């Protein structure tokens, strides 16, 4: 009888131990998952992000990992399809048993995948989307580092209008949730100047001909155009305008802040402004730390890094920062406890300081302007945003 009781108690103890074990964390390893576009329209971004993450993971593992645990990064391809993103999330969460989802790319894709993660208490950490849904409504498992497209344009539009004495502001935007965020941000910014858009025109996702839209903006004598565009559409719209001899001030969001704009669009892209938070790294950058990092990346992957490489690197670095502070007993709850009081200092890429709290999971809404000059992005403003106005060390409440 005593033997039977002892065996029963041992079995119960083992069951309790297994039940309380943290998914994705073992004695020697932490498993992270990421969903990227590796085969669709944003494959360039996805591959750069993956490489940046891999560089950070390799560096951390070479240094002994996090409290003795090595990081294992699993990356799935969504092809930039929200339905595939759900399948990828199901695989990573339910089969691979990841501890956390890191740097998932795409707004609709994150929205589709988050319910799968949250059902298993898996954090959505610093997704590659600047949509407000990445941190609103508040959820304990959502953490974002990207200020919203809406806020970027809300601040940048009146800034340029005042600096350049512009009279007629118009917009060309993608007819979807992303484009509408940019549209609304511009409207809110113009409202502070008692102005409204002089003209609005849109295009369907995948469009390649922008001649009718540009003609409409030119006919309205717009001297500034807010672009709710990403890569191909930014190049197409500006390129079309240049050919027509139409040269307003063009402003885009961080979605258009990529070296692909000037690499693919050429000289015609000079003068284009975009909001940004981290500098695009160049191997001949004036900053020695950026130059060193860029060349290290190029040596490893045999290609130049880009700003999405930086995002991937930052996301893993930020995860490691918090996970280290959570100590040996790394769980979702211990990680949240650290994150909810965490401050992150500016890094070599010129990113703004970030801070999180138990009621605010956006690190910073700050952004600044960069402009393409002589075929390269150059920062041309200080940071702006609600957080910049907040007292030192305190993020503005949302």
Give, region by region, the residue ranges found by the protein language model.
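Acidic/histidine-rich, surface-exposed loop or edge segments in extracytoplasmic proteins
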Residues: 33-41, 274-275
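Segments of small-molecule ligand-sensing domains
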Residues: 300-309, 320-377, 394-398
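Short, low-complexity disordered leader/linker segments with a strong preference
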Residues: 1-31, 384-398
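Extracellular/periplasmic periplasmic-binding protein-like sensory domains
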Residues: 238-312, 383-391
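Hydrophobic alpha-helical segments within soluble ligand-binding/sensing domains
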Residues: 85, 144-168, 207-211, 234, ...
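Beta-alpha junction/loop-to-helix N-cap segments that form part of ligand/metal-binding clefts
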Residues: 25, 31, 44-51, 59, ...
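Extracytoplasmic ligand/sensor domains, especially the bilobed periplasmic-binding protein
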Residues: 83, 97-201, 249-274
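Short glycine/serine- and small hydrophobic-enriched flexible loop segments
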Residues: 37, 58, 317-325
């Amino acid at each position: 009888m005593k033997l039977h009781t002892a065996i029963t108690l041992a079995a119960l103890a083992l069951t309790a131990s297994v039940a309380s074990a943290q998914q994705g964390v073992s004695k020697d390893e932490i498993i992270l998952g990421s969903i990227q576009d590796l085969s669709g329209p944003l494959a360039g971004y996805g591959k750069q992000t993956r490489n940046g993450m891999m560089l950070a993971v390799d560096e951390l593992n070479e240094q002994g990992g996090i409290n003795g645990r090595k990081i294992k990064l699993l990356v799935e391809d969504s092809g930039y399809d929200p339905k595939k993103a759900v399948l990828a999330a199901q695989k990573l969460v339910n089969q691979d048993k990841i501890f956390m989802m890191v740097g998932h790319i795409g707004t609709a894709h994150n929205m589709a995948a988050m319910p799968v993660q949250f059902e298993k208490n898996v954090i959505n950490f610093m997704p590659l989307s600047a949509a407000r849904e990445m941190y609103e409504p508040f959820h304990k498992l959502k953490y974002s580092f990207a200020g919203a497209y809406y806020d970027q344009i809300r601040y940048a539009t009146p800034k340029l209008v005042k600096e350049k004495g512009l009279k007629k502001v118009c917009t060309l935007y993608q007819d979807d949730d992303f484009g509408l965020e940019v549209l609304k941000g511009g409207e809110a910014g113009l409202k502070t100047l008692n102005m409204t858009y002089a003209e609005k025109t849109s295009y369907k996702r995948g469009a390649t001909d922008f001649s009718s839209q540009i003609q409409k903006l030119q006919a309205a004598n717009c001297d500034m155009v807010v672009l709710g565009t990403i890569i191909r559409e930014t190049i197409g719209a500006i390129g079309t305008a240049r050919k027509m001899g139409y040269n307003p001030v063009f402003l885009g969001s961080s979605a258009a802040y990529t070296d692909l704009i000037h690499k693919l669009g050429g000289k015609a892209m000079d003068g284009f402004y975009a909001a940004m938070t981290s500098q695009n790294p160049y191997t001949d950058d004036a900053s020695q730390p950026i130059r060193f990092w860029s060349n290290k990346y190029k040596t490893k992957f045999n290609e130049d890094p880009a700003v999405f490489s930086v995002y991937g690197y930052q996301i893993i670095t930020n995860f490691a920062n918090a996970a280290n502070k959570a100590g040996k007993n790394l769980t979702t709850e211990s990680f949240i406890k650290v994150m909810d009081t965490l401050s992150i200092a500016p890094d070599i890429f010129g990113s703004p300081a970030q801070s999180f709290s138990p009621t605010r999971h956006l690190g910073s809404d700050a952004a600044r302007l960069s402009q393409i000059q002589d075929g390269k992005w150059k920062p041309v403003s200080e940071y702006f945003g609600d957080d910049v106005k907040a007292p030192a060390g305190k993020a503005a409440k949302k």
